[in-house]
Amino acid sequence: MSTHTIGGWNIEKGGFTDYATELPPQNPKQDRIARVIQSLGADSIVISDAQGWGNPSVRAACLPEYSFTSFTPLGDDWLTSRKPGQCNLGVAFATNSPVAAQEIIDLGNRQGISTTLNLGAQGLRIAGVYLNHYSEDMRIDQARALLSYLDKDDTPTVIIGDLNTQQALHETGITEHCRSLIVKLAAAAFSAIRHPYGEHLSGLEQRKVLPILSAAGFSNTATDNRPTALFPVAPLFRVDHALVRGTSRRNYQVHPTGGASDHRPITIDIDL
């Protein structure tokens, strides 16, 4: 039996200094990003918050060891109407394995990338997604659109990316319950002064998306609740996820970010 290692990483602002419609030709963090990605040892990887990665030279500099890369913009109405400077945002995919098919996943007001690899008896499909930042209701709609797409066939599938949602509280222990209470109090305080963190934190504590994916047969690969996202400087939330259906997995890991992002990369091994 062989294995295929899949990585997922939200690279803050794509590695650039800020969100902008006009970006410099060279990614200022490209060397640091490339070192972190190389250290993961992933056969395939999904990159979210990939601002500017529609430029093939940017992808090549950050992903030098991969023979195939692709990019899709998010097409997010919420993103482009409220923050037009973020229109370069998207999801990138890279692999060293033979690609059988690749399609854009229409999530209603965002897009993902579905890539089927020529691996195993039935192939292996990797759905790279980056769900909405603030609204759990929008994330729920996007998750349902994702399932509608994936349920067309029974290809073994991995969903991986920054889902901007957390594990359901009933699946966690007392420590997470206490932390959740603190976050809810912080959300109320931020909302009282009309700070955008209020909406963001309130949405994170709704925790509805993963149960929807679980009900459709997708298993969360995480073996613990180690956080992946820094908010704003401490690792507090596990919002980057890898879920599988129709295949076995092992060796879920959270890796150091190397100072290249406000998210830690994750990897899992898929048995073929």
Segment roles from a protein language model:
Residues 47, 71, 244:
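Short beta-strand and adjacent tight-turn residues that come in two discontinuous sequence segments
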Residues 48-65, 78-88, 170-176, 235:
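Metal-dependent catalytic neighborhoods of phosphoester/phosphodiester hydrolases
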Residues 1-39, 44, 84-272:
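Active-site regions of metal-assisted phosphoester/phosphodiester hydrolases
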Residues 64-67, 98:
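Short small/polar-residue motifs
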Residues 67-80, 103-104:
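A short acidic/basic microdomain associated with nuclease active sites
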